Swiss-Prot record:
Cofactor note: Manganese or magnesium. Binds 1 divalent metal ion per monomer in the absence of substrate. May bind a second metal ion after substrate binding.
Superkingdom of origin: Bacteria
Main location: cytoplasm
An individual GO BP term: mismatch repair
Domain RNase H type-2 residue range list: 78-290
InterPro entries: RNase_HII/HIII, RNase_HII/HIII_dom, RNase_HIII, RNase_HIII_N, RNaseH-like_sf, RNaseH_sf, TBP_dom_sf
The family this protein is said to belong to: Belongs to the RNase HII family. RnhC subfamily.
The protein, known as: Ribonuclease HIII
Species of the source: Streptococcus pneumoniae (strain CGSP14)
Gene Ontology molecular function: magnesium ion binding; RNA binding; RNA-DNA hybrid ribonuclease activity
Subcellular location: Cytoplasm
Amino acid sequence: MASITLTPSEKDIQAFLEHYQTSLAPSKNPYIRYFLKLPQATVSIYTSGKILLQGEGAEKYASFFGYQAVEQTSGQNLPLIGTDEVGNGSYFGGLAVVAAFVTPDQHDFLRKLGVGDSKTLTDQKIRQIAPILKEKIQHQALLLSPSKYNEVIGDRYNAVSVKVALHNQAIYLLLQKGVQPEKIVIDAFTSAKNYDKYLAQETNRFSNPISLEEKAEGKYLAVAVSSVIARDLFLENLENLERELGYQLPSGAGTASDKVASQILQAYGMQGLNFCAKLHFKNTEKAKNA
């Protein structure tokens, strides 16, 4: 039976209780504040602030708090660089790419912090732990602003090759700081053949072999760290753009983005959209025709 112990914030505990309030059950243990009987798991929340999750579904419910099940592979237990990007699927905001260097002796610290793939963490949790990661973990962060993104897309780069360039540059600059990884993992966004094709266009190169792996953020803590820091960088950029324009900019590329894009186009013209959005997205044409 799986057993996981966590020490999340009181705010996260209350959010968990609110989400699963129908599963609350009585407990005779005086040290247990709350006890929940969930499908395939029980959750004991102690007066000390610790949480004990037990059962086959323990990992699923622990992920609510940012817990990440780490695969114990030989690669995971090596000092390695992992990279990830955030923003490529969002109309508004820039493109953030981060490379992080993590050693095995940092794994316990990262797990206790609740590091997981940024896609499973709330934005609030990401903003909370990202500053700690930036201070404790060697990394290289790059942000391509929307205006710079629009400048290079269609000229020298496309939506895939620009990511190849940023991942390569982030790794290159991190290696220049003297880190010595035994493995470099990129959260795969294209095939290895495509990556190598576009990499040939780049000036800054390194001899270390790289591995492109799908869902790498769930396998390697270094990639998970990069995912969190990149998400934080993207959110920070989005907030800065919002302050500049006076509009709330949604993440993603759905109908909410269409509506705001139309408003910005009316207020500032194409110059305004160029400042805050990736113009090659279909949202731009929808805004023009609104």
